[in-house]
Amino acid sequence: MISQIDKTELLERFLHYVSFHTQSKPNAKHSPSSVGQMKLAMQLQKELIQFGLENVEVSKYAVVTAFLPANDPNLTKTIGLVAHLDTSPQCSGKNVRLEVIEEYRGGDIALGIGEEFISPVYYSFMQKLVGQTLIVTDGTTLLGADNKAGIAEIMTALSILQKENIPHCNIRVAFTPDEEIGLGIHYFPMEKFSCDWAYTIDGGEVGELEYENFNAATAKVRFFGRNIHTGYAKGKMLNALTLACEFQQVFPVDEVPEKTDGKAGFYHLEDFFGDIEQVELTYLIRDFDEQNFAQRKAFIKNQVEKFNAKKGLKKPIELEIQDSYQNMYDVVKNVPQSIELADRAMKAVGIKPNHKPIRGGTDGAFLASKGLACPNIFTGGYNFHSKHELVSLQGMENTVQVIIEMLKCKDL
């Protein structure tokens, strides 16, 4: 058994990491896409060295890697732990101002002095958090629990393992940049992360264990128009904005994120940018089933062809589709120990595992494409990518307990 986790130390570590502005930039051509990610990477390198880890390195892409050898000759497995440095570009992560709510009593939580609030009317999970310590923002930025809670939990677990000399297997650690924009993992040094399997610590509610995720692609559709003075435009103007609006109407109205859950896929119009002369629509394509995923991509291709044939445009609309990541399950299913170990660890600390698909992606999906099984473990956070993001300190403590229990590698 480990001694009780010092919640104050865990909280302070998390708050310190949140102070780094690490928001990624979607259109970046290099990684890391923001300076703050490298600054946080250097801070983590310093701490990992202090903890006594070996081969602690930061690449020019801000990928942090480190190794902690087993302290028990009977524990021969090598387990990896992964979290990402960046925060989502969908909501500002600069100058995060926090509030720590001790012993949440239920009801609405006012965020700062503005009109933003978090309510159990909209977020029913809040009823489960009564009595816990919650960390929220002032309602002007996201929190950054995704994924700095995961970083803090990994670092706290490593600190405890070393302080208390708890028997553990070989441990690989990696902190990656630009997970939110799908860029950083492309520069991941697999040769420095040799392990039997790994876990991303990037999930949400306590108990979550995820090893299925969307197949994902991004489609960009470009429209070209012709601008003329509006007073003399009859028969001459071609409005690319109007063309784009018309094209958007061909998509099934119920196959969107706000109307789907579980394993249902969707199309998501993520961005609409341009003017009369040129417009670009950006769509996210998501589906768990590989065949359905292929059909979704084919649907967009067919609609572009039909639209061009119908309009007879001098400059036809253009389509570019790029795959982002694949469902990790095809790899994880061949390493069932990765799921069994996480299950046992949760049960050992009194947590009921909740197996569920990820309606998104993690670095684990990219690692799986390289042949490394990498399920996802909860962090205790909620409402990621939004001003309503929050994390439970008790949930974070639970994650630390599960990480330590997994690294004991019992019965493997």
UniProtKB/Swiss-Prot annotation:
GO terms for cellular component: cytosol. Its EC number is 3.4.11.4. The keyword Thylakoid does not apply. GO terms for biological process: peptide catabolic process; proteolysis. PROSITE patterns: ARGE_DAPE_CPG2_1, ARGE_DAPE_CPG2_2. Its cofactor is Zn(2+). Its main location: cytoplasm. It is found in: Cytoplasm. Pfam families: M20_dimer, Peptidase_M20. Zn(2+) 2 binds at D146, E180, H385. Zn(2+) 1 binds at H84, D146, D202. It catalyses: Release of the N-terminal residue from a tripeptide. Keywords: Aminopeptidase, Cytoplasm, Hydrolase, Metal-binding, Metalloprotease, Protease, Zinc. One of its GO terms (molecular function) is metallopeptidase activity. Binds 2 Zn(2+) ions per subunit. Belongs to the peptidase M20B family. This is Peptidase T. It comes from Haemophilus influenzae (strain PittEE).
